[in-house]
């Protein structure tokens, strides 16, 4: 199993008693993101739930925190929210340890059950429910399917923990272990690991996964008890293996600890045997193998963290930055981890056999292998283009010989891909990928085809954004400089066009030849729709609402319609529902998405940070809100003065290419007079209701509920 995000460290520096023999200790390169997530959770707890010690001893560690060692292959873009969720678990666990009767387990469980059904309602909820809602929402924005796994497994764990009041009288270690192995937080931990590492265990292998993981659960739970006993032994609700062994054998604490250490080493050996045997099996999926391999680092990471973490070893174990963040907050000491690093594989290696001196050589932080790219001509790997001083001979005979040589070294696609790679590196909510995954709950398109369709949609969407920003002269995209402002107009156009060509090539490789016709048809429609948007802007012509909606259907809705039609063409269950049955959903989601974008451009502070204040007015776009405003002004003679002023502003924008802040503020004042923003919001809410109804209709036609699609719609609600 390749390791992308971690490096090997010397386990003997931490696991001095050899509690995890045979398992490497790895350290995540983005441990900073874990600490940010933990401190954010602490700040939210104090704000929403109640007081918390400063500094709080949850998952933090002085050299590395818990997830950094226990999930060293967590995707960097998921690290912060995984840490937030686990820190919430630590804080909630401390409440249970203090007094299980005041832990509000039913409230947390109710919220998790809500998220499983696609409805997230936090109005009037208590602080812990609000935090759980926040966790699920953030995870849904990254990976809806695996976020649902987190919600389901966590809800099961909460229900298990609620039995603590009944299961307290354990007479023997063997009686205690089955309960404790689950209570160690396995259900939550299972969800967080599969989400963090993007693992999906097939349904038919879930029971086998539980069977294989049992030795790891026993080892982790007993090791946790070993290190936490000093902290817990005076708690009112203490349940700990050290105490149980002392009572069972009538021995001292030290003798009980020795008994547990032997059992911990035994269970570690049992789990390593399971790992080895699973890797050799041909009857299980690669995803199950990856899960079993990833879980071994829970053991080594947990052991190393437990030896010096503040939670078990006292407050002197916090490092300087942790103390500063605890005292002054994240606002003063924010993350030092760049967004570019969050989305890139940083280290290449092998999780089984790599040694510290065997890690791949790095050049400016990039693996040497990453500097090799397929050139797009014959599939051969050639070095990426790097400008170097010319060594060509200027002797005439040599130049003639060079001119006669056809087999010259290829130029790679690195240069043409740079603008595209820059755009796709910017923060994105991944809505279209989420839509494809959600719709595929019904259509059952094979994974290979799903990936190809996702790639096509990503390329087309990204290329259209590059060209849109250029055509609109937008300075920002997602809070960063737009592509053309960095690479120039010519390179941006060339890179975007290359994506259209590459997407065409991928589409031609899909199983059903009909997908190619769908692709061409919808791509033509998309460009025709864009032509009207540009035409109205250039000529300062206000379309009717019907014309605007038709333009949206062709442009924004076209991409949604394309992906649904292509998925239906590739679906093995297409006979259940004809193509036309998905048309209304595609139409509604396209219109909702565009009108929502129009509204947020004028009303959202977050949108202003990402794209600039009221940027649509700078671009001269006739948004839904502006069209309503103009039509309302034209229908009311008493507002003739405001209409003349608005026309003057629009003409000024055409000549100067933008509007001043003061002019945009005046336009917004006029929109308030016509109640255009409120009207837009009302239309959005009605459209959202229609979308929910259409999902119900589709659920009835397919005979299958679609919770992930419902949650996705819930997250889009304005």
Swiss-Prot record:
SUPFAM superfamilies: Terpenoid synthases. The keyword Magnesium applies. Dimethylallyl diphosphate binds at residues 477, 555-556, 594, 601, 611, 621. Pathway: Secondary metabolite biosynthesis; terpenoid biosynthesis. A motif (DDXXD 2) lies at residues 468-472. GO terms for biological process: alcohol biosynthetic process; mycotoxin biosynthetic process; terpenoid biosynthetic process. Gene3D superfamilies: Farnesyl Diphosphate Synthase (1.10.600.10). Residues 349-359 have a biased composition (Basic and acidic residues). One of its GO terms (molecular function) is lyase activity. Residues 321-718 are annotated as: Geranylfarnesyl diphosphate synthase. Residues 346-391 are annotated as: Disordered. Substrate binds at residues 93, 180-183, 224, 228-232, 311-312. A motif (NSE/DTE) lies at residues 224-232. Residues 1-320 are annotated as: (7Z)-ophiobola-7,19-dien-3-ol synthase. This is Ophiobolin F synthase oblA. The gene is oblA.
